[in-house]
Amino acid sequence: MLSAQHRDIVKATVPLLEAGGEALTRHFYGTMLAEYPEVRPLFNQAHQASGAQPRALANGILQYARHIDRLEALGPLVGQIVQKHVSLQVLPEQYPIVGSCLLRAIREVLGPDIATDAVIEAWGAAYQQLADLLIGAEEDVYAAAAARPGGWRGARRFQIARKVPESAEITSFYLKPADGGPVMAFQPGQYIGLKLEIDG
């Protein structure tokens, strides 16, 4: 449970996140992707290499710390994270991996003089609050998608029905469900996760 004291400690770390959030998230990703290779497919490796992913996470953590008393201010950011997580089929059991690696990065990057036991405890409680919020919101999206006409939950096999060259650089791929069933309505620009099986 996130206490008032925890909130105060998290808010007190905002200047540290402003100054060194990216170093913290780079360390976090380095640790997590090395020690938990099973989560690597959930992350865009080009964004890892360019630093875009660590920057985005650093900004998200900073915004969370700044608004920990007013989580409703994070609505658009949380909504975007939830949609991305659902497209990748992020599961509740993956959150403890992220949490343990994040707390470890805080301790290792900030050092024991700053990342005291009280700071780690506060950030542990704060992370759990955020994880619970995301898990709940993601479950709502998963359940709503499964309940829609043509909807489903989890992975569903599709086949390429046709390929249309649109230009020298763009090809459109039209997919159809392998089970022949209907597909729920979709919107341009929404996230979708693909796992490809390529012969040869």
Regions found by a protein language model. Give the residues of each.
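FNR-like FAD-binding dehydrogenase module
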Residues: 1-200
